[in-house]
Amino acid sequence: MTLIRGSRPRIKVLLAALVLTAGVGGTALVAPSPGTVAEQPAQDQRPAQDQQPSAAPKQSPAARAPKAASYPIGGYFVFASPSSSRNTQKLSEIKTAGADTVITFGTILAPATLATLPKECVIDGVNCAKAAAGNLEVNRYFTYSDGSVWSSQAVKCPQDRRITSQGKAFLVLVLPAQGTGCTSTNGKYDVVVAGGGAAGGMDPAASLALAATKLGMKFYAGLPLPVKRTDTAYLPDVSYQGTLTLFTERFLQYQAATNNVKGLAGFYHSTEMPVTDGHTFDPILDLYRMQNQAIHRILPTRGAIVSPYLDARVSAFSISLTEARKGIRRIAQTASGLVLNIAIQDGMGTGKGGAFQSNEANSAVDRYAESIVGKGSWSSKYVAPIRDYFLAAAAGISGTGAVLWANLEGMAPATASNPCGDSLRGQSSKARIDRQLQQLSNAQKIISFMWDSYYTCVGTGVPLKAQVESGIATPIITDATFDASTGQVRITGFNLSGGNAQVKWTTKAGQRLEKTVKPTSTNTAYGVQSGMNPELEMILVNVGKTTLAAGRYYTVNVTNQWGAENDAFYSQRVYTAQSSRDAKG
C-alpha cells in the first residue's frame, strides 16, 4: 500500500445473497466445515483449522440485547495536523462514521550530508549538526523531517541540542556510532536533525493523541523507518540499522515522557512486506522484531500494528494461500511480548486483490480492476478471492498471540470516471467498500487506508465519508447456510438484527419459492463468541421443511430494524452433493 496522494449512497438497495445449493443431502452449505470437499482454487491447501464455525453459538440474554447500528470499519489512517482543532474535528468525523481508531505513518530516518541538512537549522550562524557535534568525529548525518516540535525532554546527551532558528524548531541528536548511551566505543558519532515544525506550534502526534484521549479513541503513531535500498527497492537499507535502533529508542523514550496519554494505544510499522514466508524479506522481519522489543521495553502497555500486503494477481507476485498462512505466522513471531495486530491489506484499491464470490469466478472483473490486470474473469486474473486469504491467515496466526486485523483499501484503481483530487488512485464507493467488507468477517478489526483523502476527496460523486455516514445501518451479509431438511437458514453479517429476511430458492421439483420471515433467533454476540469480528451478528430464520435443487443458487436479502436493506452482492462457493452429505453427517 503506497501512500499517494461514486455514486450517491443508498440505504435501501435490493441485493441478493446468492448461494449455490447442495444436492442429495438437502443442506446448502456456505461456510466450510471439517470434512467438506469444495471446489477450491488450485493453490488452496487450507487445513481444517481455517474453517468458520458451523454451529450457532448458544445465546445469552446479553447476546439478544439490541445494539446501535455501526459500520464495520473501526479505524482509519490519517495525516496528523499541528492544529488541535483540525485534529479534533477530523477524529470527531471519524467517530461519527463508527470508528474508534486512527493511525499515522512514520517518518524516514534518511542519510544526509552537511550540504543537504535543513538550511534553516543553524546555531550562531553555523550548521546546527556541525555545531552540535563540535570536535567529535562524525560518522554519518541523518534527517528525520517529521515537522514536529520536539520539547527539551528529548535532550538526553551532552551534545544534544534543541534550537529555534528562522521560525522553526529543530532537535539535534548526537548518537554513538557504536555502543549505547551517550558515549561511542569507537569515538565516532551519528548526528540526526529532527523536527522542523513551526516554533511555538503544537506537535502533530501529541495533538492527535490528546484529541483521541478526549474523544475516547485510540491512536497508533508511526514508527521511524529506514530508506529503501537503491538496488532492491522493496527491501530496507540496513547499513545503518544500529543508528535506527538507537533513534527508535530515543523516539519511544520521548513518547513515554511527553505523550503517555490514554489515547496513545501503540505504534505503527510503516515498512511493508508481502504476506509470504520467503526469506528474502527477513530484513523487514528483523526490523519489526527490533522495534517491537523496544516498544515492549519502554512502553510495555502499548501494542503495535503492521500491515503486510496481498498480491493475488496471477500475472504478478502471486502469493499462494499456503504462503499467506505461513507468512503471517512469521510476522506474528516478531511480536516480542507485545500485542501485535497484523492488518493485511486487501488489495482492492491497488488491483492486487479481488473481492469476488464463487458464482462470479467466471464473470469479468470490474472496470477498476480491469485498469490494473486487464480484461478477463476474476478467476483468471486472481489466484483466489480475498476471503480465502483471510481464512488462511486466520489459520496461520492461530496460537501466536498476535491478532488478525484487515486493512481495507478505501480507494479504487484510478480511471477517467473516478478522480479523487490530485491522487494517483481513484475514488471508491460505499457499495464497493461493502463488497470488500463481506470478505473480511474473520478479521477481529477492520481499519482502512485512508481517511485523507480517499474518504474526503470530491470526485465524481458524493464524498465517501458522507456515503458511509448516511449508510451506516446497511446490513452486510457475510455468510449463509440453508438446511432444507428443517427449513432453517442461518445468516451472519453486520447490522442484521431486528427486521426480516427474504429467502428465494428452487426445489428439486423445479418450483421457485419465496418467503419473507422474521428471525426465530438473533445473536448479536456471534462475532465475539466465534473469535471473529466482534460486530458480527447471526440470525436464524425458518421457511419450513423443503428441498433444494442441485446446482442452483438460493438468494437471501435482509431488511434490518432500521429499515435498511443489504446493498452488496453476496454469494458463496460451489459445493457438490457429496460434500453436502459429508458435512451434514
Language-model regions, residue ranges each:
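N-terminal carbohydrate-binding accessory modules
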Residues: 39, 61-98
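Aromatic-lined carbohydrate-binding surfaces of glycoside hydrolases
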Residues: 81-87, 94-279, 310-318, 346-357, ...
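C-terminal region of N-terminal signal peptides and the immediate post-cleavage residues
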Residues: 5-6, 12-14, 24-64, 585
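Active-site neighborhood of glycoside hydrolase catalytic domains
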Residues: 249-250, 279-313, 325-326, 335-338, ...
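Ser/Thr/Pro-rich low-complexity tracts
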Residues: 497-507, 513-585
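A short glycine/threonine-centered beta-strand motif
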Residues: 488-497
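Substrate-binding cleft of secreted/luminal carbohydrate-active enzymes
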Residues: 83, 90, 94-114, 144, ...
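Short, compositionally biased P/S/T/A/G/V-rich stretches that sit at domain boundaries
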Residues: 308-312, 356-357, 464-485, 578-585
